[in-house]
Amino acid sequence: MIKKQLKVINKTGLHARPASELVLKAKKFESKATIRNLDQDKEAVNAKSVVRIMAEGLKQGTRIEIAADGSDEENAVEELCALVESGFGE
């Protein structure tokens, strides 16, 4: 399992569009991918579920952890984190 911590940087947080982008990217990988809200010390949720991600209420500045476990875990974490760090183009 590979994990990386980072912050949500886009002004509007992970609302419907960025959550959907994250899910589409996560679904390209065979590995199980999760996202966890570190500020509220919540359990990790499935990064392949828009509903689960949006339910976390991830706003700008929220510390999160992206993790993946499986055959392509390294690439999954790298690409998912790059997407979050890009601010989803916002």
Q: Which residues make up each language-model segment?
A:
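Compact, glycine-rich, soluble single-domain proteins
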Residues: 7-60
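Intrinsic-disorder/low-complexity, polar/charged segments enriched in Ser/Thr/Lys/Arg/Asp/Glu/Gln
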Residues: 1-5, 63
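Charge-rich, low-complexity amphipathic helices
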Residues: 1, 44-48, 75-76, 80
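A composition-driven signal for long, intrinsically disordered, charge-rich low-complexity tracts
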Residues: 1, 30, 88-90
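C-terminal structural segments of small proteins and small subunits
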Residues: 55-90
